[in-house]
Amino acid sequence: MMIKVGAAINGTDSPKAMKREHDNDDGDRTGRHKRPKTDGFTEAIQQGKFEVRLLVSSKSAGAIIGKGGENIKRLRAEFNAHVQVPDSNTPERVCTVTADEKTVLNILKDVLPRLEDNFSERDPCEVRMLVHQSHAGALIGRNGSKIKELREKCSARLKIFTGCAPGSTDRVLITSGEQKNVLGIIEEVMKELKEIPIKGSATPYLPAFNYDPSNISDYGGFPGNMPAGGPPNNRGPAPQRGGQGPPGGPRSYGGAITQGGGQRSFEAGDFQQFRGGPGPVPGYAMSAPGYPPQQGQFGAPNNAGYGYGPGGGGPVTTAQVTIPSDLGGTIIGRGGERIARIRQESGAQITLEQSNGQPERIITIKGTEQQIHSAQYLLQQCVRNSTQGRERFGGSV
């Protein structure tokens, strides 16, 4: 969700497939594209409640809603809470939960196992949460002191992306680890934020209006196989992002994967060089000032974003990398599920050749520049999050 909870997008690549029937409820259908007139967070606090907004994949949104809206109606009735997932034929949607703090946590405990956003062996649970940009600064603290305290207290990974979601004043907080630890982070965040009024204007993120696949690595959104050349539904460019946090500079990549048929060993030089490829990815930002880089967070080292998808078009090229043969199963996954997921999320064609008794296997990646970057990053994370990868290369994500 964003809580934003991370979700894998399987079978929801086309706008038609991603657009569910209006099974949220009648209210969602009639009001799903209305821009909110009030600040829901402040209104909830005034009523003694708390509003949590989760960024979830379209597939996970379907799991929250359930067939015919059955599950979302159950949540509302069982917990006497406001739960809403407005329609949007984009790869991501926003799930809003409003209730007292204890009830919010109970709803999340109910919902998290249903989500399909999590695929890391290391982190069985991952959540993405939308927070106002002024709250993001408070949660990071001076020189990163507050966010470090939260990580240590709850024994969970935690990151806040530097960029605002398109057309909004929202930033994405992402946390992962054991479910109880993730819920602990969320509980601590609620305790902190209920005492801090929002500063400045508040413009909530509305994926139906503003989703922009070219910016997902900047704000922490979900990739999807959108039509080349721009956002879905021919809406044109997303509006200018309001109140965006300080941008990071582009991050260059090492050359562990070469294009045009060349090969390079997965183990050549530093393991992290696996990120190599056709050059810097636009918007793949480093950490903001006051947010110290730290190995052991989400995404690439130094907080350089969290995944990025197919994006726009461009010339199709090929990249190759060799990996130790015994890591092939780690990339393929049970029944081919893991490599299928990477193909789905990156939009690239990925072929893993047979080892034929050789110590190394060749992975061929074909697609646009951004698709190749996305596939490289997801493959790297797949290996680094696996038990074999950690044993071989050391360290943690």
UniProtKB/Swiss-Prot annotation:
It is found in: Nucleus; Cytoplasm. Pfam families: KH_1. CDD domains: KH-I_HNRNPK_rpt1 (cd22432), KH-I_HNRNPK_rpt2 (cd22433), KH-I_HNRNPK_rpt3 (cd22434). Disruption phenotype: Temperature sensitive with 35% embryonic lethality at 20 degrees Celsius and 80% at 25 degrees Celsius. Of the surviving offspring, 30% are sterile at 20 degrees Celsius and 76% are sterile at 25 degrees Celsius. The majority of non-sterile animals have a reduced brood size. In addition, animals have gonadal formation defects and display a bursting vulva phenotype. Reduced number of miRNAs including miR-58 in embryos and L4 larvae. Defective neuronal cell fate switching, whereby fewer ASEL neurons adopt an ASER cell fate in an lsy-6 mutant background. Residues 49-111, 124-189, 316-379 form the KH domain. The keyword Electron transport does not apply. Its main location: nucleus. Residues 224-241 have a biased composition (Low complexity). Expressed in gut, muscle, neuronal and hypodermal tissues. Highly expressed in the germline and oocytes. GO terms for cellular component: cytoplasm; nucleus. GO terms for molecular function: mRNA binding. One of its GO terms (biological process) is embryo development ending in birth or egg hatching. Residues 16-30 have a biased composition (Basic and acidic residues). InterPro entries: KH_dom, KH_dom_type_1, KH_dom_type_1_sf. PROSITE patterns: KH_TYPE_1 (PS50084). Keywords: Cytoplasm, Nucleus, Repeat, RNA-binding, RNA-mediated gene silencing. SUPFAM superfamilies: Eukaryotic type KH-domain (KH-domain type I) (SSF54791). Residues 1-41, 220-279 are annotated as: Disordered. RNA-binding protein which functions together with alg-1, a component of the miRNA loading complex, to modulate the processing and activity of specific miRNAs such as miR-58 and let-7 to regulate gene expression at the post-transcriptional level during embryonic, hypodermal and neuronal development. Promotes the lsy-6-mediated repression of cog-1 in uterine cells. In embryos, may play a role in the DNA damage response. Interacts with alg-1; the interaction is direct and may be strengthened through RNA-protein association. PANTHER family: KH DOMAIN CONTAINING RNA BINDING PROTEIN. This is Heterogeneous nuclear ribonucleoprotein K homolog. It comes from Caenorhabditis elegans.
